[in-house]
Amino acid sequence: TLGDVGAAIQAVVEDAGYSVIRELVGHGVGFAPHEEPHVPNFGRRGQGAELEEGLVIAIEPMVNVGRRHIRTLADGWTVVTADGSLSAHFEHTVAVTPEGPRILTRRSGDRGSKEE
């Protein structure tokens, strides 16, 4: 489920001593680059939509060194951490296939790639 994905991200991030932004999430990918479903970077296992064959999602954890809270600057676009801590954004696009998840954005030489 999407809850399984979010719970796994949250566990890895928080176990490392960081926090996950909750207001910004990943998304489905299809004819438009940003589609349903929303893919939160936190959650509870077993909850949320099922990951069905053919689904393509962008998993986009935004990880803060400090607390998880954010704020938007006066320009209405720029988002910063509320406590001024550093933050990083990661992204992979994943397809749900009959054989399991396939990371579409993995490059040769990336950790966990078949070439490794």
Feature-to-residue mapping (PLM):
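Active-site neighborhoods and metal-handling regions in enzymes and metal-associated proteins
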Residues: T1-E116
